[in-house]
């Protein structure tokens, strides 16, 4: 979901069914490169959760900007919360003048920076043939995949995948025009286990009497005015 879907009628969308099955999750475009933010991102991000959908956010990869600049721009613009899907990197093309090894290293740089922030493996979105040709290196094996593969009755990719985007010409009440439709590979319970978890509680027993105030992130008495 992005600006291309225009203004969403969320009252209609939250009651939408696909083959008698409710729509459970929505992925929203946030950023592209190191300077573009989708004009509908903030409203779509808010409304998705407000209307009861599990939500995810994707960054559209640009080959014109460094991986580090893109990763830090995404992290500055997007504040995911517990209960959201892990961040998504949408990567669909490789420069002709770049080696596959260099391209893969750039993608891994983005993934590692974002993973360090959220402590979850980002999702890689790409299409079937691109995955086979450019992202088959074993360094990507631990990342969850969201594969676009249209005009087939079932996913032909034989590796592990989490989400299948099976059409780019879906129709849903509340959305004008076409929208991509996706299927999660597992149960609703399985899908919930994939979401960003709540932070682990602090183990107070691990804090000794000698622990300094500074290490707890509060102001120590000696610095008080």
Residue ranges of predicted features:
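Short beta-strand/turn micro-motifs composed of small residues
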Residues: 59, 126, 149
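Short, solvent-exposed loop/turn segments at secondary-structure junctions
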Residues: 95-97, 130-133
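Flexible, glycine-rich phosphate/dinucleotide-binding loops
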Residues: 35, 64, 131, 154, ...
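Proline-rich low-complexity regions
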Residues: 86-87, 122, 148, 155
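Aromatic-lined carbohydrate-recognition surfaces of secreted/lumenal glycan-active proteins
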Residues: 119-132
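Substrate-binding cleft of extracellular glycoside hydrolase catalytic domains
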Residues: 1-111, 115-120
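Functionally critical loop-and-helix segments that line ligand-binding/catalytic clefts
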Residues: 1-5, 11, 136, 140-225
């Amino acid at each position: 979901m992005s600006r291309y879907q225009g203004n969403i009628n969320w009252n209609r969308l939250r009651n939408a069914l696909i083959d008698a099955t409710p729509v459970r999750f929505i992925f929203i475009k946030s950023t592209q490169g190191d300077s573009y933010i989708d004009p509908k991102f903030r409203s779509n991000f808010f409304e998705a959760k407000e209307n009861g959908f599990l939500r995810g956010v994707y960054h559209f990869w640009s080959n014109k900007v460094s991986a580090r600049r893109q990763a830090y721009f995404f992290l500055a613009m997007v504040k995911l919360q517990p209960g959201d899907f892990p961040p998504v990197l949408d990567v669909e093309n490789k420069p002709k003048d770049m080696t596959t090894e260099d391209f893969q290293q750039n993608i891994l740089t983005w993934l590692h920076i974002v993973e360090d922030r959220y402590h979850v493996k980002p999702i890689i979105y790409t299409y079937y043939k691109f995955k086979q040709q450019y992202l088959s290196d074993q360094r990507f094996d631990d990342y969850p995949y969201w594969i676009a593969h249209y005009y087939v009755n079932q996913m032909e990719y034989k590796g592990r995948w989490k989400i299948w985007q099976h059409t780019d010409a879906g129709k849903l009440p509340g959305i004008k025009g076409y929208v991509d439709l996706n299927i999660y590979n597992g149960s609703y319970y399985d899908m919930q286990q994939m979401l960003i978890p709540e932070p682990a509680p602090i183990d107070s027993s691990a804090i000794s009497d000698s622990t300094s105030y500074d290490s707890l992130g509060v102001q120590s008495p000696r610095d008080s005015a």
